[in-house]
Amino acid sequence: MGHNPVEPRLGSLDNSGDERDREQTMSLYVAALWRYPVKTLAGEQLSSATIGPDGVAGDRLVRVRGPEGVRTARRQYRLLGLHGTLSADGTPLVNGYRWDSAEAAGLVKSAGGQDAWLEPADEAERFDVLPLLVATDGAVAAFGRDVRRLRPNIVVGGVPGLGETEWPGATLQIGRAIVRLDSLRGRCPMTTVDPDTLERDPEVLRDIGRRFGGRLALNAEVVRDGTISVGDPITITWDR
């Protein structure tokens, strides 16, 4: 992409001079974008996306449900073997089938249990925490595994090491859009599932606990909407 991130000088975020140094020395950019039209299924990688109060447009429009309530890949891990995408007219698809089709219903029952079904997502339960999840390339590299295990919406490039641990409370400006970073995300058993083979490795979650305090990537929300694209430069600021 032509980006050559520069190592920032690390220091206390309480020092405004250090904050200015960071803003001047980090060359940040959008490294990847993801959307998950069907909650808990594998998602789709994007070249550009519109973001707003509900996160990435088209994200988590449909969910899997069972008699007990919302059903996810935390327990029904084979759901991660299905792919949620959006059609050209904005309809959620499961492996290319309309979400409300008999074909999609059969796939979900096969992966998530015979008593599972699909339904439009309830706004109150649409997102586990906040509408966006922001990962950084430095933390993903330290994690040492496929970024798909973390299910981010935005991957920020040009971040050295675990710099994201100092980002809660910061804001990212990407073109017109502004994103507020709230907190580090506590990780769940979905990270233990290989996105290609669906093999489970409990050691992955234990490793996240040991090396990252159980938290990777950042919960975030959109302060000002806009359209963002892979390669767009990012400016980070701290309001402290």
Where are these regions (language model features)?
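Metal-cofactor-dependent catalytic cores
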Residues: 3, 10, 14-240
